[in-house]
Amino acid sequence: MKQSKGSRNYVFYAQHPEKEEEVPSWHEIKQTPVIMATIKGPGPAKYLRSSCTGYIAHDISMFQEPAYSLHTRHTKKRIIDINSPGPCYFLNPKVTRFGISTCPQVPMEERISNPRINCMPASCKYNLEKTRPSGERQPPQYTFGYRCPYRVMDPNPAPNQYQLPVTLGTNIPVFRAAPSYSLASTNKNWFHKENIAGGPGPAMHTRPEPSVYQNRSPLFSMAKRFGCPLDHTHRPGPGSHDIQPVTVHKPRIPAFTMGIKHSPHLCPLIVDICD
């Protein structure tokens, strides 16, 4: 087909528009039909819906329930063990949630000496006779100082001697606790739970058959069913027959033809059937 009024570029909505190119009016434009079935888009699994479980990446269009954190289960040793924690777990009683709460304190130190007296040693305190010249070689010397004094024995107990109260149970007066229930032993005052008489009950005696104290009805014996006689001779099964050598009565072995793969965009044949 020829264009008489300028050049036209047809754009299909199924594809992205291409760059327009100027085509001379005397050239013929060959249009290729677009098959809509060949345009494939992402499937439903491409768009993932936000999770409705948890609080991370939760769907904003859904209501979020309160989340609870699961901690490890405390062992029985932590409750029964009498050992207290170390000094690092000592709670300073002066530290509150508002800060340090203390009363005014005055430090008690040793008496200050007279500041007018100079404590610097005089020149006569230095012994220069034993000092050698700086350029002279001499062996290494070691000085022995005073022995360090021992640590003052503190009669107060250490922090690890205090045992922190157990926070589990209802025996703590400073903590709020839920009601607890105690399980008592089985009550032995009920007679139906104990064998007071020491003898067998009515259920221990079996009930006699009615034919013992009444007229006996006729009885019939049912024997087993005899089987029908069968032929147990060996017969060949389906696998014993060889069906390949069919050239005895046929010209050749049956074969199957493999056709071409049909296009998935081929329109099926629809025939209207009139009733």
From Swiss-Prot:
Keyword entries, A-Z: Repeat
Coiled coil segments of this chain: none
InterPro entries referenced in this protein's UniProt entry, alphabetically: CIMAP, SHIPPO-rpt
A UniProt-annotated Pfam family: SHIPPO-rpt
Transmembrane segments annotated in the record for this chain: none
Signal peptide region: none
Ranges: STPGR repeats: 200-225, 236-261
Family stated for the protein in its record: Belongs to the CIMAP family.
Protein name listed in UniProt: Protein CIMAP1C
Organism: Mus musculus
GN (gene name): CIMAP1C
